[in-house]
């Protein structure tokens, strides 16, 4: 099988790229190791639509996040949850960012940062600042279904699930990818695997990115009525 582009990973970035390339008339093949799309970082790690508040030590990243926040909200407003108060707070203990620094950072990045009393949400002495911000979450299942509907309209785009690349090699001017019993070739490969980026780099003979991996747990619980429609993030780094 020969296509114009092989995309590895059927998360948000992979399906976005597939939809854009497919709409431009390119033949696209998406390889996904899981039995369905959006099963990893897109669902587990990225439900927040970032405005940039997470990056007080990188103004450039924060500014880029704010820019793409507006774009994401414009393009995918149908999957957003916006009707809640998003509170950011700075830990009073073991944090590299205190309340004064967070205020300066938000002012420099030109993103909303309205002071609220920390005691409204936290025990006394736990946080030295709390702020009402503008940041949203999205429903990954709604967004996934939208992308699948768009891709279904493009006969030149194919997604193969449960297909983890076993081997990638350069053959002349194209890349040959083997995944199980399937072999495909393309002059262009997009690695959209996120946490699995170094697995693909190893197959390509490229040096690995110096990435620190941390386990992530999603805790589902029923909250007190006073915390309904409130999102809370504590900055302790």
Q: Residues of each region from the PLM?
A:
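Flavin-dependent oxidoreductases
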Residues: 16, 182-237
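N-terminal Rossmann-like FAD-binding beta1-loop-alpha1 element of flavoenzymes
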Residues: 3-30
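Local beta-strand N-terminus motif with an aromatic residue
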Residues: 3-4, 78, 186-187
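Short, well-ordered alpha-helices that flank and scaffold nucleotide-derived cofactor binding pockets
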Residues: 19, 23, 149, 153, ...
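Dinucleotide-binding Rossmann-like beta1-alpha1 core, especially the glycine-rich loop
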Residues: 46-121, 126-129
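Helical element adjacent to the flavin cofactor pocket in flavoenzyme catalytic cores
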Residues: 131-188, 192-199
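Glycine-rich FAD pyrophosphate-binding loop
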Residues: 22-44
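Hydrophobic anchor at the start of a short beta-strand
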Residues: 26-28, 113, 189
């Amino acid at each position: 099988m020969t296509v114009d582009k092989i995309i590895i990973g059927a998360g948000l970035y992979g399906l976005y790229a597939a939809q854009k390339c497919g709409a431009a008339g390119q033949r696209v093949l998406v390889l996904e190791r899981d039995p369905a799309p959006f099963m990893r970082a897109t669902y587990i790690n990225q439900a927040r639509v970032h405005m940039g508040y997470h990056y007080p030590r990188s103004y450039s990243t924060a500014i880029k996040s704010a820019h793409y926040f507006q774009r994401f909200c414009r393009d995918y407003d149908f999957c957003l949850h916006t009707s809640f108060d998003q509170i950011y707070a700075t830990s009073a203990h073991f944090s590299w960012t205190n309340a004064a620094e967070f205020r300066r950072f938000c002012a420099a990045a030109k993103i909303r940062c309205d002071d609220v009393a920390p005691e409204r949400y936290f025990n006394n002495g736990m946080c030295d600042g709390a702020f009402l911000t503008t940041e949203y979450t999205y429903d990954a299942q709604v967004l996934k279904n939208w992308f699948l509907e768009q891709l279904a309209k493009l006969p030149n785009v194919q997604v193969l699930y449960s297909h983890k690349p076993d081997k990638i090699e350069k053959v002349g001017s194209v890349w040959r990818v083997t995944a199980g019993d399937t072999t495909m070739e393309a002059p262009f490969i997009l690695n959209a695997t996120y946490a699995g980026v170094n697995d693909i780099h190893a197959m390509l003979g490229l040096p690995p990115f110096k990435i620190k991996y941390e386990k992530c747990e999603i805790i589902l619980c029923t909250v007190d009525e006073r915390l309904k429609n409130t999102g809370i993030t504590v900055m302790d780094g």
